């Protein structure tokens, strides 16, 4: 997948990738867990990043809810159901382009558990040719609305 600019359009969709939608709707949050389960059953990710992405996205959403912050995020991890030409905005995981409260959540997680969140281990990355600080779970923000049909196809395993 290659983007022309920081805010660009998907030129080519890669195979065997998963779209995870994060929204304020609880149904969408349940869909994230289900999509991770389906993909892990298929064995598409032997190293577990996909499961970590879902688990920690959910924990991050809970962290935001406790602070009264909105949870209308869209997380894109390895998606084959994106359409060419879809406009996206990408950011690094955790530290700079996503949000400061994600960074605080990772600090809290590390303090409480004694370990770094698996999806953000320092030895991960770089990914998709981004700079060396882009590690772990890659977060994309999709500006176009993702249709219900795409979510349904993913949930049905198509």
What would you call each of these model-derived segments?
Residues 1-158:
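Short, Lys/Arg-rich flexible segments
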